[in-house]
């Protein structure tokens, strides 16, 4: 073995095994690409992305850790989300979305959350 060498097992590594998944359709209405990282609270992403934010509440992208998904302007795509794990507490990020994910009605405190034209549709 060499320093830094990684010895992997045989076969693929399952991604988020046994976790429930949600599929949502996202449209980038912004004039430039938006990139979202693997562990970012999806409901709090750039308001240029339009999707059902209530359905995304408490979820993150179902992609390998350290990767991201890029949303090009005007393009619609479907993404798969999994619940945020661990303590289900989101620190920082955007203040109106930060804190406990459970126990507050699954709605952030942002005054415009859920309004049409604020990156939300049902």
Swiss-Prot record:
Origin organism lineage: Bacteria, Bacillati, Actinomycetota, Actinomycetes, Pseudonocardiales
Assigned keywords, A-Z: Cytoplasm, Hydrolase
Family membership: Belongs to the urease beta subunit family.
Disordered: annotated span: 92-122
Pathway field: Nitrogen metabolism; urea degradation; CO(2) and NH(3) from urea (urease route): step 1/1
Pfam families found in the cross-reference section: Urease_beta (PF00699)
NCBIfam families: PRK13203.1, urease_beta
Main location, first listed in the record: cytoplasm
GO CC, any one term: urease complex
Name of protein: Urease subunit beta
